[in-house]
Amino acid sequence: MNDKLVEQYEELKVLIESLQVDLVKNASGNKSAGVRTRKALRSVKKIASDLVKSSLTADKAQ
């Protein structure tokens, strides 16, 4: 179960790092980058939620 937690955390970390380019472009006025950023943030929210659920499940299993 711990492997799944680490995998989900790494996925979350990569996604957040990939947001940086579009976030900077959006701050400079690029509206398309803003759309991509918001879409990626929704994915971040989902992955973070899944990570919390997996963490709780792992705690209960111990």
Predicted features along the sequence, with ranges:
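Short, charged, amphipathic alpha-helical segments
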Residues: 34-42
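A structural signal for well-ordered alpha-helices, especially hydrophobic packing surfaces
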Residues: 16, 20-23, 45-48, 52-55
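A charge-rich, low-complexity, intrinsically flexible signal that marks solvent-exposed coils, linkers
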Residues: 15, 33, 55-56, 60
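Intrinsically disordered, compositionally biased charged tails
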Residues: 1, 60-62
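N-terminal acidic leader/helix
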Residues: 1-22
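Short, surface-exposed loop/turn segments at secondary-structure junctions
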Residues: 27-35
